[in-house]
Every structure is written in C-alpha cells, then in structure tokens.
C-alpha cells in the first residue's frame, strides 16, 4: 500500500509540471504551430502594468510548498504528511527566435529548479521516513506578452526510510518522470497592459508527452486535448508578501471551462514577474510560492531619438527629442 500511495503521489506531482520593445540582444539565435481565438473584455481601472522586458540571467528565488493534504485525505492511506516544503529558483537562460504558428517569434527560455521535502520524518502506512521531490522545468515563453508555448518538467521522487535519521543510504527511488506540455496557441496567462476588472478567455490545444522510468509508476500515455481557460484581474494591492515595491501588485485569477478557480498569480511590475502564486494541480495538490529574492541583470542605458521631420533638406534647423532610460 505504501508503494501504491507513493506511486500515486509521484504521478500527481508530475501533473504539477503544468509573461513596441527595445532590446540590447547580446545573445540571440532560430529554432512550428495554428491559429485560435482569445476573447478580451476590458473594464475601467485605476492602474495598469505593461509587459516587462527580461534579460538573460534575470533570476527570481521563491520559498514555497506543495500542499498534499486533500490528496492524502482521499487516498485511504494512513499518513501524517500534509505539505512538502521547499524553494524554487527561476532564471532566464536564453532569448532566441523560433517558429510558432508559422511565424518567427522571439521567445525566452526560462529554467526553474525546485527542491521539496517533508518536514522531517513522516509515516506512510506505518513506515517512517522522509519524502523528497526535485523538479526542473524548462519553459518557452513568448517575449511579446509572456504567453507560455511549452513546458518540459523533469520530476525526481525518492523516499529515505528512517534509520537513526532519514537514511540516504537506504533511499528508495520512486521514479524520474518527464512531461512536456505544448499549447497552441501559446497560453496567455496575462493580457497586457494589466488593469483591474479586465478578463479574457482562450480556447487552445494542449499536447502532453510523457517519458521516464520508474519501478512504481506507470508512465501515462501521451495525450492531446482541447481546453478552455479564462482569467480575471480581480484586484490591485498587497499580496501578503512583504517584498519591497510590490505593495500594489495585481491579482490575476485563472478559471477552468466550468468556471472553477484553478489558482492565481500576484503580478508585481517592480520585479517584472510574480511576487506570489497559488495553483491547484491535479489530484488536489496546491502549489504555493512567495518571492524572497529578485536579481535582475544590470540594464544598460537606452537612448532613443525622434526628429521633427524624418526627411528634410540639409542645413536647416529642426527639433529633436532625446530620451535616455
């Protein structure tokens, strides 16, 4: 029964692995997909946030946890595990062009590395030990609006039985699993500029490919589904995370096709990303992360010049506007 529960947990965690520009592109390179509709309805607001510009090596660090309490309660297994605590390290690794929907599209490649573990020894059907989950996520995100084109997640789940402490030398590898989700068109988690009261909906195709190896977990079959998701900017204010510059963040809440809430992001313009996120995953998992550190790459000065008359005779006096940021 313990192995069965751990297997189910591994599969559930696997499902967890479900934002006019001016660029100084020192690193730039080229790497296919169809057209669908997104529906936007806008309302009045008191503040807005435009699409941020990321740089290679921009980094966000989060503390967080996976709340597995509801899943455990429904599993029928005797255990005292409630959450797996950990951290998430998110970095912009690259910027390049790739083919999306028949068009050359500028994208970010973003890597997230998460490490989670039980709070000391737990019990699963009478066996004590520590449960660990390591995750690596590679996301391809469209530069123009931070829409997600794909996510590839590698999940490593293992259990250390208790023997004078949690014994790594007795470690049981539950499995290493890989899941890749591709969204066509890319999933618009934000509709910039963000403003309170705005809502939008997308119909899209989601292709999911599975691979990996495990002695306990059956690797799921690949799938392709039609889905619909909607979002709403429900408020602007304090997310509850005391991070400097983020006291006027935007709460963007997501809903499934039945109108059920599936999670939310608190978008903070000052950190060019989320200060807090809460997402309900398959099997009742809840993933919660809060920002603890934002390390942007130093932005260089950008000079733009506009002239009164782009075409004019030589040797005449015209006006020009110079902007330095």
Go through the PLM ranges and name each one.
Residues 133, 137-172:
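Low-complexity, serine/threonine/proline-enriched polar segments
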Residues 14-18:
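Hydrophobic core
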Residues 23-136, 145, 172-315:
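Acidic, serine/threonine-rich low-complexity disordered tracts
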Residues 2, 20, 66-67, 142:
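Poly-acidic low-complexity segments
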Residues 9, 20-22:
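Cleavable N-terminal signal peptides
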Residues 2-13:
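Sec-dependent N-terminal signal peptides
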Residues 318-324:
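Aromatic/hydrophobic beta-strand junction motif of beta-rich domains
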């Amino acid at each position: 029964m313990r192995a069965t529960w751990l297997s189910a947990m591994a599969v559930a965690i696997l499902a967890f692995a479900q934002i006019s520009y001016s660029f100084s592109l020192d690193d730039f390179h080229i790497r296919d997909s169809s057209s669908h509709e997104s529906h936007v309805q806008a309302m009045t607001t008191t503040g807005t946030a435009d699409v941020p510009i990321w740089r290679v090596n921009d980094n966000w660090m989060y503390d967080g946890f996976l709340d597995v309490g509801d899943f455990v309660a429904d599993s029928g297994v005797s255990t005292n595990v409630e959450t797996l605590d950990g951290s998430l390290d998110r970095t912009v690794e690259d910027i390049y062009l790739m083919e999306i929907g028949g068009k050359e599209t500028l994208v970010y490649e973003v890597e997230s590395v998460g490490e989670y573990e039980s709070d000391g020894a737990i019990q699963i059907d009478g066996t004590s030990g520590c449960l660990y989950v390591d995750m690596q996520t590679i996301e391809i995100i469209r530069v123009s609006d931070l829409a997600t084109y794909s996510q590839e997640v590698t999940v490593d789940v293992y259990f250390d039985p208790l023997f004078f402490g949690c014994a790594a030398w007795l470690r049981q590898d539950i499995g290493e699993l890989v899941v890749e989700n591709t969204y066509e068109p890319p999933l618009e988690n934000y509709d910039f500029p963000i403003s309170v009261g705005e809502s939008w909906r997308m119909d899209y195709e989601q292709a999911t490919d599975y691979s990996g190896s495990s002695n306990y977990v059956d690797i799921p079959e690949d799938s392709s589904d039609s889905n619909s998701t909607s979002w709403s900017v429900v408020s602007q204010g304090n997310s509850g995370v005391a991070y400097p510059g983020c006291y006027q963040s935007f709460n963007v809440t997501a809903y499934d096709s039945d109108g059920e809430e599936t999670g939310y992001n608190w978008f903070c313009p000052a950190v060019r990303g989320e200060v807090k996120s809460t997402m309900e995953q398959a099997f009742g998992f809840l993933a919660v992360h809060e920002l603890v550190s934002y390390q942007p790459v130093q932005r260089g000065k950008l000079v733009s010049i506009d002239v009164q008359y782009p075409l004019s005779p030589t040797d005449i006096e015209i006006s020009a506007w110079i902007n330095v940021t």
